[in-house]
């Protein structure tokens, strides 16, 4: 029953993939009491299914291609072996693996067992891992064999398993592939049981623990499938590192919900040319990448690459209009934007076949009632992006684990509060303004950092930009831009003047960036700019002298 209900909802969205109005109006999420996505959907769909489910290509030319049927059987073997290692329903497993087949085996196996998976990036340092082990109440650790030293100073009552090599004191996951390919669950799984525990990237505070259920991500990501425009047989490439929610979004649930192939290209060092060549060589049909990657790709001559893609998507941070324009000019395909969080699936997006308004993230996705709420708690044309809890979306998290106060803070007054602000127009298109704590006032005018950053990266020398308030005796605060430059450009007084001139011709006087500084931008390990760090640095600097690469608009005559 759960399989047919899930597939019926999926098929409805795929049948209306270019008919947004019908999809949004008539979509009914499946109502499930018991549901285990890996057993009740994936295994049923995978039985006798020889279509490719996973295709991993390495930069040395080697590759692995696994069918749906193979992934079902391999994950059964891993589930049986993990059960033998003591993994029980509800146990928390920290998984820190690269883009390798055992990662997908382990994720499927954990779901089948009813365990709670805590994905972690391989970039984590021992102190970060200690935090995850302690706050995440981890009972089992599964990691790549090259990372075991990070755990030497992390004692604890957890089982230890490696992938890829033998290490003293650790079990090897490779032993699992001697187990039976048949798996029997120990009982039913409730749709409300916990499934995933994610640590957020911490752009503004200490990482929070986001707890998702057996339906919130698996079923909720039907909205993500719809936004991406995925169809059966697609070769879908999502450029994202394991350990982050976006990897689970688009390298696990969304493509497999659609019956598509997950494509992975493993490289030691990012180069735009290698990405574009792989895109062509492997006939990728749908590509999703963060704005940072898109900004690097457009520095190549995209017209030299005869891609076969149908859908292009940006995710992770808002897309700047300049990037969308350049991709459209080169390939004739509209790069589509969207919005979601670790706490949810895709909430807002420009869906396939719909008119795209430059600068807008699109419209609410099927299954989401999105409202903009102002400072007085009223629904408005500009305000915080909120979800109406009267029709609570399936894709919303259960809670912040072990933090009822924080959960109550974001789920108050009948809304889930995202902490992001936006504006909505008469057609229902939503335009991102910024994090609620990023928007600031200068001379009593509200300033959106994202708007100014979008203009800044239109300058030929600017690769990335972050705008924060800088204290000013007269205006209280003025916009200051921190800039990294494209290859071939060096910071200088002359370049600073040229950027100020460029901005004066494109921004109203009250919006102008009055100060700028060249240098590297602080980022989280997931690649998001830590504006909170830049903002705090400005607040704390006091009367400290300017840096050698810092310039004020007032230094120049125009």
PLM regions: where:
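Conserved AMP-binding/adenylate-forming core of the ANL superfamily
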Residues: 50, 54-108, 125-130, 214-215
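Conserved AMP-binding A3 loop
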Residues: 64-69, 188, 195-219
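ANL superfamily adenylate-forming
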Residues: 60-61, 146-191
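Gly/Ser/Thr-rich phosphate-binding loop
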Residues: 257, 284-289, 298-357, 369, ...
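Conserved ATP/PPi-binding loop(s) of AMP-dependent carboxylate-activating enzymes
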Residues: 378-409, 447, 541-542
């Amino acid at each position: 029953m759960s399989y047919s209900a899930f597939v019926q909802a999926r098929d409805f969205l795929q049948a209306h993939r270019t008919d947004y109005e019908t999809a949004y109006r008539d979509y009914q999420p499946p109502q499930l009491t018991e549901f285990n996505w890996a057993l009740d959907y994936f295994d049923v769909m995978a039985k006798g299914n020889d279509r490719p489910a996973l295709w991993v290509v390495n930069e040395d030319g080697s590759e692995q291609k696994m069918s749906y049927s193979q992934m079902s059987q391999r994950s059964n073997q891993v589930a049986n072996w993990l059960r033998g290692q003591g993994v029980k329903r509800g146990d928390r497993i920290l998984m820190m693996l690269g883009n390798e087949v055992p990662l997908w085996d382990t994720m499927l196996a954990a779901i089948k067992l009813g365990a709670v998976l805590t994905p972690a990036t391989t970039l984590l340092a021992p102190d970060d891992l200690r935090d995850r082990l302690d706050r995440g109440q981890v009972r089992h650790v599964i990691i790549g064999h090259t990372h075991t030293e990070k755990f030497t100073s992390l004692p604890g009552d957890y089982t230890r398993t490696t992938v890829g090599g033998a290490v003293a004191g650790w079990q090897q996951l490779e032993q699992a592939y001697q187990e039976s390919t048949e798996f029997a669950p120990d009982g039913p799984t409730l749709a409300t049981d916990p499934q995933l525990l994610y640590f957020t990237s911490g752009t503004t505070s200490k990482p929070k623990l986001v707890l998702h259920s057996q339906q919130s991500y698996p079923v909720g990501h039907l909205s993500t499938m719809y936004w991406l425009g995925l169809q059966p047989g697609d070769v879908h490439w999502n450029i994202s590192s394991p350990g982050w929610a976006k990897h689970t979004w688009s390298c696990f649930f969304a493509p497999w919900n659609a019956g598509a192939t997950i494509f992975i290209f493993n490289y030691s060092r990012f180069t735009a040319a290698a990405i574009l060549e792989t895109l062509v060589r492997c006939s990728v049909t749908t590509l999703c990448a963060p704005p940072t990657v898109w900004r690097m790709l457009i520095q190549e001559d995209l017209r030299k690459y005869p891609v076969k893609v149908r859908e292009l998507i940006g995710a992770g941070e808002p897309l700047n209009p300049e990037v969308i324009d350049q991709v459209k000019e080169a390939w004739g395909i509209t790069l589509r934007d969207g919005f979601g969080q670790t706490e949810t699936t895709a909430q807002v997006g420009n869906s396939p076949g719909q008119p795209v308004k430059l600068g807008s993230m699109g419209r609410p996705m099927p299954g989401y009632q999105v409202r903009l709420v102002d400072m007085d708690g009223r629904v408005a044309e500009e305000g915080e992006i909120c979800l109406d809890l009267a029709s609570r979306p399936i894709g919303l998290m259960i809670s912040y684990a072990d933090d009822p106060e924080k959960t109550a803070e974001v789920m108050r007054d009948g809304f889930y509060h995202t902490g992001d602000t936006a504006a909505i127009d008469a057609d229902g298109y939503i335009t991102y303004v910024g994090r609620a704590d990023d928007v600031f006032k200068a001379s009593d005018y509200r300033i959106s950092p994202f708007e100014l950053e979008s203009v800044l990266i239109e300058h030929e020398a600017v690769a990335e930009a972050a705008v924060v308030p800088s204290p000013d005796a007269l205006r209280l605060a003025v916009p200051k831009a921190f800039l990294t430059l494209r290859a071939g450009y060096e910071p200088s007084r002359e370049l600073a003047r040229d950027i100020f001139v460029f901005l004066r011709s494109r921004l109203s006087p009250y919006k102008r960036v009055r100060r700028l500084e060249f240098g590297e931008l602080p980022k989280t390990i997931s690649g998001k700019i830590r504006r909170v760090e830049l903002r705090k640095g400005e607040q704390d600097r006091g009367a400290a002298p300017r840096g050698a690469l810092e310039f004020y608009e007032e230094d120049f005559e125009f």
